[in-house]
Amino acid sequence: FRDPKIWREADGTYSAVTVCLAEDGSGAAALFQSKDGFDWHFVTVLERCNNQYGKMWECPDFFPLDGKQVLMLGPMEMLPKGEFHNGHNVIAFIGSYDEATHTFTKENVQLMDGGIDFYATQTTLAPDGRRIMTAWLQTWSDTEDKPQGCKWFGQTICPRELHIKDGRIFQTPVRELDAVHGKRTFHENVTVQGETTLEGIKGRVADLTVTVQPGEYRSFTLKLAADADHHTSLTY
């Protein structure tokens, strides 16, 4: 189906991971190989949905990461269960891969992002060895909701570096974003009582590192880019 991932192997041959519908009507990820990039032959099915993770699968990716192998894809029509939400998700199967037998062994499954419009991930390998991911910030179902007179509508995420720790994928903004940082503002040892305003933090774009000490509270909220009528809130 949509967006197979093709890459060139070290020996000059080509591999592709694709997705399809299996006999039970749910998704499957298949591996194909080619000597010239034109004539392809089927190798194996890497993973099957078995009606556990949505129905149709899209946008597959298959790559090594920190000693593990990752199969990342976007399931459609998922039901909310555990960390997964309804509709479109992006999930990663983390495990091992035997290149001799082309056998992928799944060890863990995780959601890549909790945003309901996060979709269609793709990764690339940077020259320095970093695995970098991009994705949509808006799905097709929202394309008719653009404001009147809007010249463009939709964007992709800031690229993220991927790493594996304790069997899960961790994501951080690419280090190149450090080059666009402006003035730095520090607040330390702040005791928060009710609503507290920190001076010097303003604007629509900010890179924040916030450390919160445990205390006698059940939740706290950060309000960003706030004016009299609007704000963005993050609640933990």
What are these regions (language model features)?
Residues F1, S26, W57, G87-V90, ...:
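Short, solvent-exposed loop/turn segments at the edges of secondary structure
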Residues F1-R8, T18, W40-D61, M78, ...:
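Surface loop/turn signatures of beta-propeller and other carbohydrate-active proteins
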Residues D24-A30, L79-I94, C158:
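Structural motif
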Residues G25-S26, G54, R204:
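Residue-level preference for beta-strand/loop junctions
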Residues K35-F38, D98-A100:
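Short loop/turn segments that connect beta-strands within beta-propeller blades
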